[in-house]
Amino acid sequence: MISPFLLLAIGTCFASSLVPEKEKDPKYWRDQAQQTLKNALRLQTLNTNVAKNVIMFLGDGMGVSTVTAARILKGQLHHSPGEETKLEMDKFPYVALSKTYNTNAQVPDSAGTATAYLCGVKANEGTVGVSAATQRSQCNTTQGNEVTSILRWAKDAGKSVGIVTTTRVNHATPSASYAHSADRDWYSDNEMPPEALSQGCKDIAYQLMHNIKDIEVIMGGGRKYMFPKNRTDVEYELDEKARGTRLDGLNLIDIWKSFKPKHKHSHYVWNRTDLLALDPHSVDYLLGLFEPGDMQYELNRNNATDPSLSEMVEMAIRILNKNPKGFFLLVEGGRIDHGHHEGKAKQALHEAVEMDQAIGQAGAMTSVEDTLTVVTADHSHVFTFGGYTPRGNSIFGLAPMVSDTDKKPFTAILYGNGPGYKVVGGERENVSMVDYAHNNYQAQSAVPLRHETHGGEDVAVFAKGPMAHLLHGVHEQNYIPHVMAYAACIGANRDHCASASSSGSPSPGPLLLLLALLPLGSLF
């Protein structure tokens, strides 16, 4: 057995050989730092324009360790060592931290957090679009405790609005933008208890079609929740799990169509080919449901039937951008979270790289002069990578050392808990005997669990565009939509823009200095 110290020494020598020649010259690092300093000094001139458009990218489960690992993967996919690569979100000038806890949970879930960063109030885990006065699964605690989202505020201000996700369109993140539910799992009436139905609560898919009837763009998965129970799916005709789920017999696609004005052009599509064939200039309303449940992982995506997140974002912006009053767009890279829960780090990180591609696509189609873009996560995961790996080491590769106890190697990527806890012959599995580069390889975990869990640490918030500087420190997660609304002059922040306009000011700037100087605690 090779000594772990020898392995570390070999790894260190190997790392030295991977150092790019230009990085050996101190001038390279000094010039880079000076350029970064110049860029930072230019930020002294604040962008206080009104945000005509607001785009929010939500990487579900995209904690800081996931961001870093995705950065390395992006670089390695382009044949570089990876560590020096810049994600699109890395280029944003303003970065903050968001405290993710729910009102009743130290380590949060995606529903309570979605209510925070979309509706501006913290809530209990498992609930969407309601205050903390609503208890999970208790329908009778819902009425009177509903809270509205920034999507609603934007719609009320005359803007176009859109939702794009790689999960079901009635999943936790998107549902908080339009629904009010005591339970995030009430996807259709089939998932609701009889008591909740008898008390008048509606399932989330029903609320999607009825609560805000004029959402211009809705794209993601979740077809089966829109159709009567046992209705055969258009794509997976022989798959019983893909069949319709609704007990009330409603066809929500038909209902969606019936709500649209006759003089407007509405389109429902279920595959990539039909989506890309659309002329966005002749589309007023778009509903795209590309899977019965969640959309496929990016690595598993069928190019004929499944659009990428980038493609959906491009189509959404082309449709929404026609409104002279602007738009609000929520984009979720939702399957980052699913990959981590399954212990499949490769799936999770490729999802994160694709979301970053979508961020770049949106940036190319908009301007920082009138578009506020915010990128953040709802929570993190117990995902880590380490082990003194050398520069350029495959992010999915082995660490250059072995365990002090069982003398076996380990991958750089590990989970604190999850399904990757493998015991073979009474001992930890020897990862050198398995294909740890496989797309569905489950990285080893310290504690055996069927599903890996969320993490409780703060997550990053990246921002660019009008008023992005208001995201500048450590904030409660529910602060985020208040900033977006202030920048766009919508919701509770309309009055200050009206007064600024009447006084001849072109932006919400008059209150800016006051906001910047006040301690965060005095604002909420």
From Swiss-Prot:
Disulfide bonds join C139-C201, C489-C497. Residues 500-524 form a propeptide. N-glycosylated. This is Alkaline phosphatase, tissue-nonspecific isozyme. Phosphatase activity is specifically inhibited by 5-((5-chloro-2-methoxyphenyl)sulfonamido)nicotinamide (SBI-425). The modification Phosphoserine is found at S110. Glycans are attached at N140, N230, N271, N303, N430. Belongs to the alkaline phosphatase family. One of its GO terms (cellular component) is side of membrane. The active site is at S110. Keywords: Biomineralization, Calcium, Cell membrane, Disulfide bond, Glycoprotein, GPI-anchor, Hydrolase, Lipoprotein, Magnesium, Membrane, Metal-binding, Mitochondrion, Phosphoprotein, Signal, Zinc. Binds 1 Mg(2+) ion. Binds 2 Zn(2+) ions. Calcium-binding is structural and does not influence the alkaline phosphatase activity. At very high concentrations, calcium can however substitute for zinc at zinc-binding sites, leading to strongly reduced enzyme activity. Alkaline phosphatase that metabolizes various phosphate compounds and plays a key role in skeletal mineralization and adaptive thermogenesis. Has broad substrate specificity and can hydrolyze a considerable variety of compounds: however, only a few substrates, such as diphosphate (inorganic pyrophosphate; PPi), pyridoxal 5'-phosphate (PLP) and N-phosphocreatine are natural substrates. The lineage of its organism: Eukaryota, Metazoa, Chordata, Craniata, Vertebrata. Its EC number is 3.1.3.1, 3.9.1.1. Homodimer.
